[in-house]
Curated annotation (Swiss-Prot):
Its EC number is 2.7.7.68. One of its GO terms (biological process) is F420-0 metabolic process. It comes from Halobacterium salinarum (strain ATCC 700922 / JCM 11081 / NRC-1). The keyword GTP-binding applies. One of its GO terms (molecular function) is phospholactate guanylyltransferase activity. Keywords: GTP-binding, Nucleotide-binding, Nucleotidyltransferase, Transferase. Pathway: Cofactor biosynthesis; coenzyme F420 biosynthesis. Guanylyltransferase that catalyzes the activation of (2S)-2-phospholactate (2-PL) as (2S)-lactyl-2-diphospho-5'-guanosine, via the condensation of 2-PL with GTP. It is involved in the biosynthesis of coenzyme F420, a hydride carrier cofactor. Homodimer. HAMAP family: CofC. Belongs to the CofC family. It catalyses: (2S)-2-phospholactate + GTP + H(+) = (2S)-lactyl-2-diphospho-5'-guanosine + diphosphate. This is 2-phospho-L-lactate guanylyltransferase.
Length: 209
C-alpha cells in the first residue's frame, strides 16, 4: 500500500531545542525516527513515499517529493493525486511497529484513523480521494466529524505504538523502553541513557570526558 510519510527537514523538533545541543542534532534525531518509520512501513507491506517540506540533506530509503505547502494541504494533495488506498503515517512515530501498521492496513472503512495521545491524528488511511484532512487543533475529532459529514465510514485503530509521537523530552523515555531500531541506537551513540531519579524515569546525557 502506498504510504505517505510527511517530513520537515528544515527545523525539526523545535520543542526539543533545550534537550539537544543544536538544530543539527535535532535534525539527526528526526532523520533517525524517519528511518524507523520507513522501515516499519516497509516491513508491514507498505510502499513508503516521503513528502518533505524541503530537499532532504541526508540519505533517505524511499522516494522523496518536495511540497512546501502546509501539512494539511500537502497531505490532501498526496491522497488526491496518488493511487488508492493511500495511508499517511507521521515521521515521528518512533515506537511504530510493522504489526501496528498492519492493523491499520487491514482495517475496514472508507477512512481509518489512528489517534495521537494529545488529540492529534498520527495515521490516516484513505480509500477514497475526497477524505477531508486537517491537522490543526484536535485533529482526530475533526477528522471523524468531517468524514462522517461527508458520508464516509470511519474506523479507529487504538494503538499505543501509533499514538506515541515524540514531541518533548518526556517522550524519550518511551523511546528507550520500546524502540528497538535506529532511534534508540542514535540516542545511545550520542551519549544519552535512561536513568531513574527518585523513582521517576528520565533520559540524561553522559558528560564528555
Amino acid at each position: 500500500m502506498r504510504t505517505v510519510v510527511p517530513f520537515d527537514p528544515r527545523d525539526p523538533k523545535s520543542r526539543l531545542a533545550e534537550f539537544f545541543a543544536d538544530a543539527e542534532e535535532r535534525r539527526g534525531f528526526a532523520y533517525a525516527m524517519l528511518a524507523d518509520v520507513l522501515g516499519a512501513v516497509r516491513d508491514a507491506g507498505g510502499d513508503p513515499v516521503v513528502v518533505a517540506t524541503a530537499p532532504v540533506s541526508r540519505p533517505v530509503d524511499a522516494p522523496v517529493t518536495v511540497d512546501d505547502r502546509a501539512l494539511s494541504t500537502a497531505v490532501a494533495a498526496a491522497i488526491a493525486d496518488g493511487p488508492l488506498p493511500t495511508a499517511v503515517v507521521m515521521a515521528d512515530l518512533a515506537l511504530a511497529t510493522p504489526d501496528a501498521i498492519r492493523r491499520v492496513f487491514a482495517a475496514s472503512g472508507d477512512v481509518v484513523l489512528a489517534p495521537g495521545s494529545g488529540g492529534g491524528t498520527n495515521v490516516v488511511l484513505a480509500r477514497t480521494a475526497d477524505v477531508p484532512v486537517s491537522y490543526h487543533g484536535v485533529s482526530f475529532r475533526d477528522h471523524v466529524t468531517a468524514a462522517e459529514r461527508a458520508g464516509l465510514t470511519v474506523t479507529t485503530v487504538d494503538s499505543f505504538r501509533l499514538a506515541a509521537d515524540v514531541d518533548d523530552a518526556s517522550d524519550l523515555v518511551d523511546v528507550f523502553v520500546h524502540n528497538t531500531r535506529r532511534t534508540r541506537e542514535w540516542l545511545i551513540a550520542g551519549g544519552w541513557r535512561l536513568a531513574v531519579d527518585d523513582g521517576t524515569p528520565t533520559v540524561v546525557r553522559e558528560p564528555n570526558d
